[in-house]
Amino acid sequence: MIRSAAVVLLSGLIFINTTCAQTPATSMARPEATATAEFNGMVDRYFDGYFHFHPTEATYAGFHQYDGELENFSQKSRDAELSFLLEAKQGAGYAHTDLLNEEQRIDLKLISNAINARILELQEIRMWQKNPDIYSSSGTSSVYLLMSRNFAPAADRLKSVIAREQQIPANLRDAKVNLKNPPAVYTEIALEQLPGIISFFQKDVPDAFKSVTDAQLLTQFKASNDAVITALGQYQNFLKQDLLPISKGDYRLGPDLYRKKLLYDDMVEMPLDRLLQIGYDDLHKNQAELKRVAAQIDPGKTPEQILAALEEDHPKPDQLLQSFRDTFNSLTGFLRDKEIITIPSDIRPIVQETPPFARALSSASMETPGPYETKATEAFFNVTLPEPSWTAEKTKSWMEGFNRGTILSTAIHEAYPGHYEQFLWAKQYPSKTRKLIASGTNVEGWAHYTEQMMLDQGYGGGDPKLRIGQLQDALLRDARYIAGIEMHTGKMTLAQATQFFVKEGHQTPAVAEREAQRGTSDPTYLVYTLGKLQIMKLRADYKQKVGASFSLQQFHDEFMKQGMAPIPIVRRIMLGNDSPAL
């Protein structure tokens, strides 16, 4: 899915009304169907252009004509993309929407916002100038997508890997030109990531293509792969020796850029001080509920003591995959029995051990195919089991991360009725634009909303141990919400944010450090809680609108049908007005 889209809307289709009005004969020959065809053609050309600049996203979406291309970080490429974007923005401003139906006007709004978001990134936020990790990690992600799904024979996918690998050294050279005084935390994170990235190319990429027997192809692959490993090693030395000592930049966006980013990505227009107060209100509500539930479990222990004890309740490693399968079965049965949401397909995600080449990247992950993937259409839920070589202490610590409460919250958020459920509805999304442009407040807001909603509807039989785990996860998202705003508006330092996650978010120091660091480069990770609150308000407003005929299943189904658009757009469709999302 695309969080922000960019490229050119070709002027011949942007000026739909101008073209239609040239002569009476032309006007008569332009019925609504013709205007629709022209608009759809514009959308197709828009995404073709977008994927030219972002081929990794094209591979995920299922457009494999871009599999041999890689993102280009040169000044020339940046200038070309910006030129297209500015032309597109000018054209969109002259578009006459009177010939478009409501669905098309919504799509035009989504595309216009995506153009503005990408221009903001290139011209003002400028992560290409500040974040060393994007250069080393982008190539990894691009190659990983070619490895992880069998949409073509292994030899064909390896040819695309070679083509992409041949472009990675140039990107790393461009990084040395582009990077100007990055924040120290960005350079430090990039250095922390690089050993794993180098290992990925040394071991995981070759392992993924062991079945290929073409000697000439394997020789080409060894050359391209060795060149990437060498270039990454040189980049690592550059970061450590040259860039880190001068990394004294500021990661903060500042209030103005923060507001713009929220507006273009998620259509949030609320003043930041009011937005922040909403976050604190939700934090305090969840903190009070955590204390109440903890006292219900054991009044003699603190919430932290209870949460620590709950980590001991986990399956054995050889039972972990089955535990997730059983949880999926239980969740889908509950959803159907209680008529909470329609499950469009009986096809389940395949629960499997994380493939060897991805084990270093994730503990658990849901991998769904893109909306236009026609070959590798399976979805995989990957779970990383402890390595046989690990010590007993390390294995114990790892399995504590898969305690019963975590298994449930992960299964709800990632699968039913969270991300996988939303994926199952994708075929019903009303347009190409709605399939390809996604809002974080919708996607992550929905998945987070379902964690609480399922327990509210009675899943787990009111077990307070499940509720306290759900509340800890909610407090983590509340802390993200607040820390993101306050760090990027200069009200909270990185160290203060770390302590905030511990003290107010009830997280361990290790989790707190990782979460605070994430917030420096993911400033709007408030979308989890923000989207959840927006969906809860939409549900209340929708219930008021339809009255006694309200059905939770009907509400959820209608929400799913709208795609992954920002909540204000979903509200407009479901409520018929532009009332406030919060």
Protein language model regions, located:
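N-terminal secretory signal peptides that target proteins for export/translocation
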Residues: 1-2
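N-terminal maturation segment of proteins
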Residues: 22-582
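Bacterial N-terminal signal peptides
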Residues: 5-17
